[in-house]
């Protein structure tokens, strides 16, 4: 599964610096800046390219990587969809769940 689309969640996010790029990972969750409520949050925004990835997967050699920065606020751990996403990501990293990890 590796997450549903179009969900809203309040949480603190990381803003990645160079050399972060989508060119070597498959982003599974990112901020939707077309949403007025999300776009209105300007305090502390440092990225100028509008690319705010929150979770991704990638293959590294013979291994698999799952990264997710969700979880700064307590409410995140009460969201069944987020918990399912964590489980899917762990299963992907273990090799128990297939997912397309090609960058896009």
What label would you give each PLM region?
Residues 34-55, 59-104:
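Extracellular ligand-binding/catalytic regions of CAZymes and related secreted enzymes
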């Amino acid at each position: 599964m590796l997450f549903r689309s179009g969900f809203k969640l309040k949480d603190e996010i990381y803003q990645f610096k160079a050399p972060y790029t989508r060119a070597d990972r498959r982003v599974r969750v990112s901020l939707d800046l077309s949403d007025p409520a999300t776009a209105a949050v300007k305090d502390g925004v440092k990225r100028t390219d509008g690319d705010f990835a929150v979770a991704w997967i990638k293959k590294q050699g013979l291994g698999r990587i799952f990264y997710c920065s969700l979880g700064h606020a307590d409410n995140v751990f009460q969201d069944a969809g987020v918990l399912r996403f964590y489980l899917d990501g762990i299963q992907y990293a273990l090799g128990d769940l297939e997912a397309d990890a090609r960058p896009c």
